[in-house]
Every structure is written in structure tokens, then in C-alpha cells.
Amino acid sequence: MNNNDVEDIKKLKYFRLLAKQYPNIALAATEIINLEAILNLPKGTEHFLSDIHGEYEPFVHVLRNGSGVVKRKIEDLFCKSLLESDIKSLATLIYYPEQKLDIVLKEERNIDDWYKITLNRLIEICRFCSSKYTRSKVRKALPADFAYIIEELLHEQFNGIDKEEYYDRIITTIIDIGRAKEFIIALSKLIQRMIIDRLHIIGDIYDRGPRPDIIIDTLMEYHSVDIQWGNHDMLWMGAAAGVRTCVANVLRISTRYANLDLVEEIYGINLLPLATFALKYYRDDPCESFIPKVKEDDPAANQEVDLVSKMHKAITILQFKLEKEIIDRRPEFELEERLLLDKIDYEKGTIILNGTEYKLNDNNFPTIDPKDPYKLTEEESVLIDKLVYSFVNSDKLQKHVRFLFSKGNMYLKFNSNLLFHGCIPLDDDGNLKSMWIQGEEYESKRLLEKFDSLSREGYFEKVGSEEKTYGMDIMWYLWTGPVSPLFGKKKMATFERYFIDDEIAHIEQKTGYYKLRDREEMCDMILREFGLDPSESRIINGHVPVKKKNGESPIKANGKMIVIDGGFSKAYQKQTGIAGYTLIYNSYGLQLVSHEHFSSTEESIMKEKDILSTTLVVEQKLKRKTVEDTDIGKELQVQIKDLKELLLIYRKGIIKEIR
């Protein structure tokens, strides 16, 4: 038997399986017709968001309002028949149906009339938003309680009085039986869902913001989402895997921004051992360099500043000690220069870095032995073990991190776009930077794929195995390493920022990627590395805030790269001048939406105050893109090809039809 015979047998087995799904010519032909019809529909709308940094309120609002698209749809339909105030009220109802209905029920005198008018408007909006999708796709999105009725109303054609009466009777019955409120909620959520076909989160769900957990809970309920991991995401993923350096870093950042409610209340991590340790060793230390960044209007956080400052310093020193064991174990990480505790002159209170002597602003190190500065005290060893245990055994954190692994990756190719959070490692001349991992050299696409697989091993492999240990070390490297695609800098100057006042020592030099990202030829080279055609592809990423207020454009390299970190995080909004970007990719092309500051969910509901958004057309297609032009379209074309071959097999009698 030769290779051709083997291939023919495999092929026949495949078609016998396909024949079970389509057992005769009629069914196979019908499916071909259906798939061909789908190919000609407009492509679904994709939304891209990045660098949310735990700011759940603006994130949830942007999802609910479709980055301003919901209101534009209302205006398209009702601009000639509704006042602006009515449009705002209708939009708010769609964004927050439960809360808005509670207000309406208290204020509206003739609620049945209001229900009838509102239901008719919502059905019209829903019909408009769902018109580019197949009935099958819309049907799958319908809430089970109202699936049949909504489908009837969406696809009703008013060709006569009887049809209109039928439609009106359905609406009246919904109101009469007391289900109007639930029906409005169902329609509002369906509209939200129809606006966004696919959501891309390009990294950093976590960081300093208060509630990344709400963001992940929201994404877990979302109909279609993918995530490209950010450096802060990887740090939390490493902590959940039990990486001691990641645990210390997470707690350092959490104490720095007084964001301990997330750690203690939401994830149930016991911080009492850290507080007890910090009070013992830093009771009389003002810890001035470690005073957390708290809001003036947060009295609870301000009351705890002294304790949190001490916890902040304690975990920071512990972090510096813990990093040595990985750096020593993995010389290929090339991070020896970040070992600084042994470079301190503890008597003089100085340190020499790159030939320059700096005076330390703090020389109180009660847990450091100058003769062996990286050695953990017995209490430190017990402390880090307790903290790691809490992270590894937090059910909610583990559930969230498993979701990040299931929906996430280091990069994604999707509909000719290349998505990644940070960068592709390059040197200053634009050459690809490589890294030796387990005796083999990796760069570019292979490097990102290797980091992806090693991270999964760090989380999922058996405790104590070499695979898990190496993967755990890589997870920390991805947070801080010079060839990490999630970091993008030559060093992380954490020690210098805490202990040296001279800001020259704080400089973290970016890698070549950020110096050269305005060059079209560099973007073309990266796209080719990932198997994409530069003439029709682009890079979409975040990580570095775009300083729009200084005139910086998010559109780089003649449109080959779009950077969408616009400052969801309040801490960066002074730099960016805006409060975030959404990139929208629909059948007409690309639109970049910049968002103004979001006050609060409460104000959005009570005052019907929406986020002000400005839309910039990045790319306008003369010919509307269809499903055929997408990745799903390519898959459907393969299915059509196979089904056509199955028809031929039936007609030749190779496989018998079942009628």
C-alpha cells in the first residue's frame, strides 16, 4: 500500500463521517446554499479594548453602549421623530435596563402607554441591529424565555392590517400579563449583544484599578471574547500559579495603590501575616518612600496609610530577596545586573550603579544581613509560604486565572490583524532579538509561542516537576525580562524608584520596537514573520499610553500599527488627555473611538450622562467587507468545498445516500 492509498482511505473515512451529518444530496445541497448565503452577509463588528487596569465602571459602560454605537443607531432610526432628551433616555434604558426601569416605574403615571411605546422602539432598534446577521445566529442569541416571541417580532413583515394587529396583540399581551419589564430587559441586552460580534481585550485587565474581578466576571458571561495577556495579567497569573516573586510583586503594587480590598475581600487572601510582620520590623519607620498613592476622598484608605506603608516596604524588600533565586537558577535570563542588595554600602547608605554613587533615601533594612543580603530570615520564609498558600488556594482567583488561560494567549491573528499587548522584541537597529530557552534559540513568532506554552506549563503542570518550575520562572520573566514581549524595556528600575531620589537612575529605556514602530518597513517585517500579508494587515496593540494631548497619534507607520492604550486607567489620563480608545472594525472599515472621562455609573443612570466619544475613520472600504473576507469565511469555504465533494461522491455511488 503506497502513500496515495493511505490518503484515499483517510479521505473516505472523513467523508463517511460527514455523510452521517448530511446523509443525502438534498441535505448536503441545502447546507451549501445556506453557507454560500452566509458568505455574502456583512462581516460582524469587532471591538478592540486594551489596558483597562481594573477600571471596571468605564469598561462596563463602553461594553453596554457599544463605544457610542448604540446611541448612533437610535439617532439613525429616530433623529426625525424623537427629541434629544428622548434619545438619551432610550439609550440609558438600553445600557442599564434594570436600574432605569426602577426609576421609570416610580415616575411614570401611565406605565402601560410607556411600555407600549418603548417596546415598539426597542423592537425597531433590535431589528435594525440584527439585520446583518442570519436568523440562525440571532436565534442563538435570544433569551430562552422570550425566544419565540422576539423572533416573531423581529422578522414580522407588515403587508396588511391583519399582520399589524397580530404584532400589536403580542405587545399588548406582554403588558397585560405583567412581563413588560422582563421583556424590555431582554431586548436591551439583545441590542447590546448584536452591536458587538467579537470583543478583543488586548491585555492588562489587572493593575492598579479597584475591581479587575468585575471585568473578568463580565467577560466570562460575554458571548464572544479573546484576550491577549498583558504584563500585569501575567503577574497575577504567576501569583495564582504560586510563583513567589509574582506574589510579592502583586502585593507590592496592591499596597502601593492601597488596593487591598481586592486582595483581601474579593480574593480572600489573608494579609494578617504581612501586617504583623511589617509592624514588628518597621513600627518606628515612617516608610516615607512607601506611602501608598490614595485618593483624598477615600477616608478608609487614608486611615490605614501608616500600616499599609509598612506592609509596602516589607513586601518590597522581600521581593528583592526572592528574585535572586530565579536569577541564579536561570543565567539565560541575563538579569544579574538587577541584583542590587549586595551592591549597597550599608554603613554609608549608598549604592554604586553604572559607575555613579547614589545616596539612598532610606537606609533602614532590619531584615537584611549585609554579609548575606539575599538570605531570607526564618520569619520571611514562613511569611512568603503563607502568602503563596493563600494565592494558590483562592477559589475565585483560580477561576479567573483559568479563564485567562482558556480565552487568552500571547498573540492572536484574527481577520488579517495581528493582536498582541506589548511588543515584538527587537534591538535598536530593528533586528529580531532572540532568547535561548532550554538549549534552543527562539525569536519573533516562535518566541511568543514558546512563552505561551511555558506559561501554561507553569500553571498546569504537576507541582514539583521541572516543567512547572521552569514555566513558573518564565511567568516572572515575562513581567520583568528584557526580551519579554509583555514588558518592552531593558530593565525594570523598581529599586531605583524607591531608594534613589535622582530621577536619572529611574530611567527605563524602551527596546528597539518602540523606537522604530513608526517605520512602515518594520511593521511589514513583523507582519510577514507572523504569516500575514502587509498589504492588507495591521498590528493592533496597547501597553504604552498614547499622549494624545501632546499631539501623538495612535495610528503609526502609515496605518500599519494602531496603538489603543488611551488611558482607561485614571492614573494615565493626565498623560493621554483622554480616557481610553475603542477600535471598531466593521464591514465598512476601521474606526477609532476616543472616550472622554467617565464620571460614574450612578450619574449615567440618574442624569442620563453618557461618555462623550469622538470617532475617527481610520480606513474606509469602498466595497463592504463580507463574511467571505474573514477567517470564519475561509473556514466556511473549506466546508463548502468538502460538501461539494460529498455531492460528487454520492452521485458516483461511492457512498450511498440515506433518504
Swiss-Prot record:
It catalyses: beta-D-fructose 1,6-bisphosphate + H2O = beta-D-fructose 6-phosphate + phosphate. This is Fructose-1,6-bisphosphatase class 3. Its EC number is 3.1.3.11. The gene is fbp. It comes from Clostridium botulinum (strain Alaska E43 / Type E3). Its cofactor is Mn(2+). It comes from the Bacteria. Belongs to the FBPase class 3 family. SUPFAM superfamilies: Metallo-dependent phosphatases. GO terms for molecular function: fructose 1,6-bisphosphate 1-phosphatase activity. It is an enzyme of class 3 (hydrolase). HAMAP family: FBPase_class3. Keywords: Carbohydrate metabolism, Hydrolase, Manganese.
